[in-house]
Regions:
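Alpha/beta-hydrolase fold active-site neighborhood
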Residues: 253-393
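An N-terminal hydrophobic leader/cap segment in hydrolases
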Residues: 1-35
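Gly/Pro-rich cap/lid or specificity-loop segments adjacent to the active site
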Residues: 21-49, 53-258, 372-374, 378-390, ...
Length: 476
């Protein structure tokens, strides 16, 4: 597959306003666009999907109309548009309920930005993808795969460029990318640098020039550190966790939706380490499971429901299906269940984890996917063939033009990033390698250990203030 759709010219599309309302001092307008399913083969594939973008602007009763108005909501803000790209893959952007929800909205509105929250294709109010849709609309896994190949970062960016051309064709805009959204932002820089005024990234410097294997070797190392920190803070959880694992292995525990609670699925709960408060959150869940087992010899329905919905792999299946594919680009690149293949011995579940050695530490894993999930997660059981196709595919579209990225400088398209020293998902180690090899002339960083991966949410004002200081400073 070529890097760029042949003769790609962003269209100027009409759009529908599917909702518009005022919440105190903000106006929220939901804009719906019909875009090509496949940008690479539009001559033979005429299918369309819907993309919804949520436009948020400052509202003053004496100046603005209640409903969406193109002139006052788009034209008047055309020089200060900020597109927010959500993390994931496979998660929608938030639907704002106030200037403080999401927390990072207010700092942007204070700077007079119009903020466009994109529901990336396959998520939220855009044409969604879930197991039922894939099973009901396609005859086999090959057809499913041909469809979802169009839901990667490159297609997301073609959507962005199409929307920009439909709203502010003669202007540049800024982009704010959180986590996977940061990866998408750098893809945007690769394809359409002329469309970007500036790029802000939080916890999302992509591992340019690296393979999935490189990524997981790095993330296992920091996940090990998080496990040690967890057990140091809650030493009694060493025996509690081993007790829970032994009970899980001795039982057939069925979750409310029919999924299975196995020791492998239990191990996935370590994904929560990556956010501020994640260690404490996991401790609370471990304590509840342990108390359930000790007092009733079973895990309560409420606790099982919490475990079932803890990670989002079933409600957002692209998060499972594309977890490793986001690291694949170009001919010959494939993942082949990289996290599974690179799993260190001390993360592998053994008999000592099943209660036979109460002092051994059971290591939880991080943001990783494994073949066993297909059997343990109810919504994934019908996607086995599709998952295998994805993990063995070797002809992915290219997501980054490394030469173009290398040649970019801060004077052309400035990049500023909040880089978290203890980021479980996007490791500081890899970010520094990428900075040296590809972004040394274009990237300024706010490096901190005050926040984990969710710094944009928990420290919005400080994080964004620092990023704008980096953009505006002449002395860095």
């Amino acid at each position: 597959m070529s890097r760029f759709p042949s003769n790609f010219i962003p269209q100027k599309l009409k759009f529908d306003v599917i909702d518009s309302y005022i919440i105190k001092s903000i106006k929220v307008s939901l804009l719906q666009f019909n875009v090509p399913l496949c940008y690479y083969n539009q001559s033979t594939n005429h299918k369309k999907i819907k993309i919804v973008a949520k436009l948020v602007t400052n509202y003053q009763k004496d100046k603005h109309t209640i409903c969406f108005n193109f002139q006052e909501d788009v034209d008047a803000n055309k020089e200060k548009f900020m597109v927010f790209l959500q993390g994931g893959p496979g998660f929608p952007s938030v639907l704002p309920t106030s200037k403080n929800d999401p927390s990072f909205l207010e700092p942007l509105l204070k700077r007079d930005y119009a903020v466009l929250f994109l529901d990336q294709r396959g998520t939220g109010l855009s044409t969604p993808i879930d197991t039922k849709f894939l099973v009901n609309n396609f005859q086999n896994a090959s057809q499913q795969f041909e469809y979802i190949k169009n839901f990667r970062a490159d297609s997301i960016i073609f959507d962005c460029e199409t929307i920009k051309n439909s709203l502010i064709p003669d202007q540049k805009w800024s982009v704010l990318g959180q986590s996977f959204g940061g990866f998408c932002s750098v893809t945007y820089l690769s394809f359409f640098p002329e469309s970007l005024k500036q790029v802000l990234v939080t916890g999302g410097i992509p591992p340019l020039g690296m393979t999935a294997d490189d990524v997981y070797k790095s993330t296992y190392k920091i996940t090990r550190e998080f496990n040690e920190r967890y057990y140091k803070r809650y030493p009694l959880d060493v025996s509690r966790v081993n007790y829970i694992v032994s009970k899980i292995d001795q039982s057939d525990i069925v979750l409310p939706n029919g999924g299975k609670l196995t020791s492998e699925r239990f191990q996935h709960l370590g994904l929560t380490f990556g956010g501020n408060g994640g260690i404490d959150k996991l401790h609370g869940l471990i304590l509840k499971i342990y108390q359930d087992l000790k007092t009733t010899e079973s895990i309560s329905y409420g606790t099982l429901a919490t475990i079932q919905d803890y990670l989002g792999f079933e409600t957002n299946i692209l998060y499972f299906l594309f977890q490793e594919a986001i690291y694949c680009g170009g001919k010959g690149s494939f993942s082949d269940w990289s996290a599974f293949r690179n799993k260190p011995d001390d993360f592998k579940i053994t008999s000592s984890d099943s209660g036979q050695n109460k002092d051994s530490k059971f290591y939880f894993t991080g943001e990783m996917v494994y073949p066993s999930m297909i059997n343990d997660y109810s919504e994934l059981t019908q996607l086995k063939e599709l998952a295998e196709l994805i993990h063995n595919y070797k002809d992915w579209s290219t997501l980054y033009d490394l030469d173009k990225i290398k040649k970019n400088t801060f004077d052309i398209v400035p990049i500023v990033a909040a880089t978290y020293y203890e980021d479980q998902y996007v490791t500081f180690e890899n970010c520094e390698i990428v900075k040296r090899n590809y972004l040394k002339d274009s990237l300024r960083q706010y490096i901190t250990n005050e926040y984990f991966h969710n710094g944009l949410r928990v420290g919005s004002e400080k994080v964004l203030n620092r990023l704008f200081e980096l953009l505006e400073s002449d002395n860095v």
